[in-house]
Structure formats: structure tokens, C-alpha cells
Regions:
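Conserved serine/cysteine hydrolase catalytic core
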Residues: 104-169, 178
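Conserved alpha/beta-hydrolase catalytic His-Asp/Glu region
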Residues: 67, 71-124
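Conserved hydrolase catalytic core segment
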Residues: 7-54
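C-terminal alpha-helix
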Residues: 4, 196-204
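Active-site acidic short loop of glycosyltransferases
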Residues: 9-11, 145-146, 173
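Internal catalytic or translocation cores that form aromatic/hydrophobic pockets or channels
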Residues: 4, 46-86
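Catalytic histidine-centered segment of alpha/beta-hydrolase-like enzymes
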Residues: 182-192
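Alpha/beta-hydrolase active-site loop
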Residues: 1-7
Length: 205
């Protein structure tokens, strides 16, 4: 990711990361000496933090990395919805539109469009290793200087209320916004969710 940012040479840099993308954002923002053309200005951590709930990691590990084979985009969307109801209410049209970016043609059908090796950390993680990693992630978080927003699904099983509240008191002392009726993780399809992020990114430093 550092190599990509250096290749792009952005004039300004904001980071919006959900789940794993948020963890990568914490790693980058928590290391101010990384050779980047610019520092991250604003950071959005979507339903993720330094401490993650083990039961949620186990749940995600049960399906992540399985690419599947589908006859149509709609069939793929239906399969993803079956394991994604925690994303909160979506109309069928919204979910289909969201799903289209997640599939790719494969032979005569479709498969999920991501690297299955993404699942390796979930497959090798243990409750003990997850706890051990928390200290490192908290150290990175405490070192973040970017203005930070945490968005959390009020029913999230990955980012606990206690962790989210602790993140508002230490490190960058993030702003916390929760969305009712949503678990892990908000998709920002709903206008009220998108507005929170847009207002944060476009607002005054």
C-alpha cells in the first residue's frame, strides 16, 4: 500500500477503511516515519478498532475466502446477503448494486472478486494471538495524528462499545458515530450513513 501511495503521489490523502481496510489504515497512520508523499489528513475507521471480538473473528472466518460459483450476479448477491444481514437494511436494488462490484465473470458464470488468500489470517488466528495483537494495535492507534472518525454499527459483534468508547479517549480521540439497526459493518449506502462520512471528510480540520 505504501508503494501504491508513492506511485500515485497524491497532494492530499484521506483514508476510509472498513474492517481489514481500517486495520491497514491504523498501521499506516500509526507510523509517522513511513516514506509517504503526504501524511493521512483524515482517517475513517468503519466498525474496526485495536481490540476485536474473538467470536466475530470466528464468525467471519467461517465464510471468508470462499469464492463460490454462481449462474448470475443476482444469485451471487442472494448468496452474499444470506451471510451479510448484519450490514443492516438494504433494498433489493441497493444490495444488487453493491454486489455487482464484488463479482467477476468466471467461465460460464460468476465468482466472488477477491483474493481467497485474504482469509489466511482468519484461518490461522487464535483467541490468544488475537489478544496478543491488541497491544501492538493500541500502540499504533495511540500514535495516530490524523483527525479520526469511528463509524460503528450499534449491533456490531466485532467492535465492542467499550473499545469504541476507549478510542474516543486516547490516541487521536476519535469522534464516534453509531448507526442503529446495523451490525458489522455499515455500508454507507444509506444516505444518513454516507452524510456522516462526507461531512467529516469535507469539514474543517
Amino acid at each position: 500500500m505504501v508503494a501504491l501511495i508513492n506511485q500515485l503521489q497524491p497532494k492530499t490523502l484521506d483514508w476510509v477503511g472498513t474492517s481489514m481496510g481500517g486495520l491497514i489504515g491504523m498501521v499506516i497512520c500509526g507510523q509517522p516515519d513511513l516514506p509517504l508523499p503526504v501524511k493521512v489528513r483524515k482517517l475513517v475507521l468503519n466498525d474496526v478498532g485495536p481490540a476485536l471480538e474473538w467470536t466475530a473473528i470466528q464468525r467471519i472466518g467461517q465464510y471468508i475466502g470462499k469464492t463460490g460459483q454462481f449462474d448470475s450476479v443476482q444469485q451471487a448477491a442472494d448468496a452474499m446477503w444470506a451471510i451479510s444481514s448484519s450490514f443492516g437494511p438494504h433494498t433489493p436494488e441497493q444490495w444488487l448494486a453493491l454486489s455487482q462490484a464484488m463479482v467477476k465473470p468466471s467461465g460460464t458464470g460468476y465468482t466472488l472478486h477477491y483474493d481467497p488468500s485474504f482469509a489466511i489470517p482468519f484461518g490461522t488466528a487464535t483467541e490468544e494471538s488475537t489478544k496478543q495483537g491488541e497491544a501492538m494495535l493500541w500502540a499504533l492507534y495511540d500514535n495516530i495524528k490524523a483527525q479520526t472518525l469511528i463509524t460503528r454499527g450499534a449491533q456490531s459483534d466485532l467492535l465492542s462499545v467499550a473499545t469504541a468508547q476507549a478510542m474516543t479517549l486516547r490516541g487521536p480521540k476519535a469522534l464516534l458515530v453509531e448507526f442503529a439497526g446495523v451490525g458489522h459493518a455499515p455500508t454507507f449506502v444509506a444516505p444518513d450513513q454516507a452524510k456522516v462520512v462526507v461531512d467529516f471528510l469535507l469539514g474543517a480540520p
